[in-house]
């Protein structure tokens, strides 16, 4: 198992050296970088704003945060506008069904045939 650990350490050292040497458009470790820029092949540290030899830039985490609130706001806006209209329309037919009942009782009193 010790040989496997040594091979893993050599692989990590080689990966760090490859980022330090840099290729086209790659800045060396310790160089100043901007968040979201592709000049740093590793990771641009947010606190120190320095290049670090890590695979997987943090640019992938930003669009997931931006897309989640847009999905949340689009859904409830349609349901909120339709819910109050349904609530106001539902009690109206119940009131209309109750109102004609006293009018039917009043009609025979308004028609005096004895005179």
Swiss-Prot record:
Its subcellular locations are: Secreted
Task: Tell me the leader sequence span.
Answer: 1-22
Q: Could you give one GO CC term from the UniProt record?
A: extracellular region
Q: In which tissues is it expressed?
A: Expressed by the venom gland.
Q: List the disulfide bonds.
A: 26-41, 33-44, 40-51
What segment(s) does the record annotate as region Disordered? 54-115
Its primary localisation, in coarse terms, equals secreted
Q: Where is the composition biased (Basic residues)?
A: 68-77, 86-115
| Keyword Disulfide bond assigned | yes
Identify the keywords attached in UniProt to this record, alphabetized. Answer: Disulfide bond, Knottin, Secreted, Signal
Q: How does the entry describe the domains?
A: The presence of a 'disulfide through disulfide knot' structurally defines this protein as a knottin.
Name listed for the protein in its UniProt record: Cysteine-rich venom protein 5
